[in-house]
Amino acid sequence: MAKLSRNQARKAKNLKIRTKITGTAERPRLSVFRSHMNFSAQLIDDSKSITIVGITTAKKGSKEYHGNIKSAHELGLKFAKMIKEKNVSKIVFDRSGYLYHGRVKAFAEALRSEGIEF
């Protein structure tokens, strides 16, 4: 049997995680995605199948190095303010199969420092 690539293994982990967690209107799911150059996140209400709010480093005007830990932390602070504007304080964190380390951890800690509970 062939060895799974990193991305295939991550997708398998993500599928396993997604069967256990769902987002509701009271407690939406925060899904993160990281690529080599960018980082993005979106708040999802799975009961209505809608994205409440999303953010990414791939927009015009972003800093030159948007794939690093510092940018993920800054993005987390901005995203926390956007979440609070939507009157959401509790979320379900979906790390999408990525390890809770580096950019994912920096993003999550920035959200927690702004008072978002998960």
Swiss-Prot record:
Keywords: Ribonucleoprotein, Ribosomal protein, RNA-binding, rRNA-binding. It comes from the Bacteria. The keyword rRNA-binding applies. GO terms for cellular component: cytoplasm; ribonucleoprotein complex; ribosome. It holds the Pfam family Ribosomal_L18p. InterPro entries: Ribosomal_uL18_bac-type, Ribosomal_uL18_bac/euk. Signal peptide: none annotated. One of its GO terms (biological process) is translation. One of its GO terms (molecular function) is structural constituent of ribosome. Gene3D superfamilies: 3.30.420.100. Belongs to the universal ribosomal protein uL18 family. HAMAP family: Ribosomal_uL18_B (MF_01337_B). Part of the 50S ribosomal subunit; part of the 5S rRNA/L5/L18/L25 subcomplex. Contacts the 5S and 23S rRNAs. This is one of the proteins that bind and probably mediate the attachment of the 5S RNA into the large ribosomal subunit, where it forms part of the central protuberance. This is Large ribosomal subunit protein uL18. It comes from Mycoplasmopsis pulmonis (strain UAB CTIP) (Mycoplasma pulmonis).
